[in-house]
Amino acid sequence: MWQRITVVAGTVPPRQSHYTFRYEPMFELLPPLNDHNLPWMDTIHPIVVHFVIAMGLITFVFDCIGIFARKPALFEVSFWNLLFATAAIFVAIIFGQVEAGLANPYGASSDILNLHSTIGWSLAGILSAMSAWRYVIRSKDPKQLPLPFLGAGGLLSALIVVQVTLGNQLIWVYGLHTVKVVEAMRAGLV
């Protein structure tokens, strides 16, 4: 990303450009980084992602209760939870990618962060596909839910739990974006 291009006219050999381009990075437009190595007060990704976690897991819970307790009204609730989880995961990913880029991972945290990012994007695709599938199911008969969809919801829930575990490791084991780790990195200790 570049702020501007400065064109300097000059004499150059024939058949070459008459202009020299100088690129200046746009980093000077960003606010300074704080104690957490972020341009804003604290990490936003974990705040947004908690909505995705809650809505993704409660969707499966409502589907199970709806099927086994024969309460089809819960299918409508789980559909809307799934839809909002799908929208929210993209917001979580955007903030997660920015914050991951500013994290300066070290050691094994780099591999965990890469896996966490990959699974996050995969979850976005899976949630989108499941929302579309659920919309088709709901359009045909809103009071029925096929067991294969319930199985897919169970696998989605398991993947969410794995993703939560990886995110917890990044914060509670490796301390990415915590003040002490950022201070140690800035001092060259990590």
What are these regions (language model features)?
Residues Y19-V190:
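Polytopic transmembrane helical bundles with strong interfacial aromatic enrichment
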